[in-house]
């Protein structure tokens, strides 16, 4: 069984050191993308990625310093580097070494630049969302660039993990880079909904946190059979069979905590 997550825009400033790191499987395919990104100015990067000029300059510097081979001196493990809501739910820094070993076999992070990452794959800081209108040659976007490659890697990983299911905890933007019809495993997508004045609906900040929290639950409980996911009851959610379909499993929560404003890049408040 494999679990899929999206990456995050926010990256951690500091990460713990890890001995047994690995290299991204599709690193060679990332190199042509970086080569082209290196030619873009901060202004062009900001325009391409819909960023402030300050963040455009940050990413220009990132790509200018992007170099292989990846080592512990110039790169960091992916699971500790991403720092968005999903990864606040995952809390990778508090996972045990045994947890990380299980995650290395069963957790995959989809990426616009790296294609697909294992938790302990080294990566250098970047910003390149899968939906960015950026490609190479006649391939006009990243979906066309990656083509079947991501799906092929996932199929190999499914074979290695000995499972026949993919738990899709990634966003639709990233899962669009996977071709479900070519996957050798069944795809199950958990959906998290909170009760509001007009009934149950997806509250994105909570949904993202729960994607990470469910991934953590799967890792810590060594779950390899999809049916066991229905036992998940984190943060007040419960599986709702009447609201679910065969491949979309809905989890409902009746009472949600108040949203706390959080600072984003550039000091903005959400």
Regions from the PLM with identified roles:
Residues 4-94:
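Active-site helix-to-loop segments that bind/position phosphate- or nucleotide-bearing substrates
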Residues 46-47, 106, 264:
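RNA-interacting cores
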Residues 92-260, 270:
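Internal, well-folded beta-alpha domain core
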Residues 15-27, 178-187, 264-269:
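Surface-exposed flexible segments
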């Amino acid at each position: 069984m494999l679990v899929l997550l999206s990456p995050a825009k926010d990256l951690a400033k500091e990460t713990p050191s890890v001995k047994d790191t690995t290299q991204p499987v599709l690193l060679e395919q990332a190199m042509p993308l970086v080569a082209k990104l290196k030619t873009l100015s901060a202004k062009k990067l900001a325009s391409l990625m819909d960023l402030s000029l300050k963040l455009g300059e940050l990413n220009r510097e990132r790509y200018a310093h992007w170099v292989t081979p990846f080592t512990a001196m110039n790169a960091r493990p992916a699971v500790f580097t991403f720092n968005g809501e999903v990864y606040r739910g995952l809390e990778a820094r508090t996972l045990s070494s045994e947890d990380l070993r299980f995650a290395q076999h069963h957790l995959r992070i989809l990426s616009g630049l790296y294609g697909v990452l294992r938790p302990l794959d080294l990566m250098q800081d970047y910003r390149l969302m899968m939906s960015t209108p950026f490609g190479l040659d006649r391939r006009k976007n990243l979906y066309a660039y990656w083509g079947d490659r991501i799906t092929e890697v996932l199929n190999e990983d499914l074979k290695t993990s000995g499972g026949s299911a993919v738990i899709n905890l990634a966003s639709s933007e990233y899962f669009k880079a996977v071709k479900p019809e070519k996957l050798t495993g069944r795809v199950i997508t958990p959906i998290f909904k909170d009760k509001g004045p007009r009934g149950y609906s997806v509250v994105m900040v909570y949904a993202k946190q729960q994607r990470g929290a469910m991934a953590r639950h799967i890792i810590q409980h060594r779950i390899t059979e999809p049916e066991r996911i229905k036992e998940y009851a984190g943060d007040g959610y419960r599986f709702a069979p009447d609201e679910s379909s065969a491949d979309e499993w809905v989890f409902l929560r009746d009472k949600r905590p108040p949203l706390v404003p959080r600072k984003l890049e550039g000091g903005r408040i959400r």
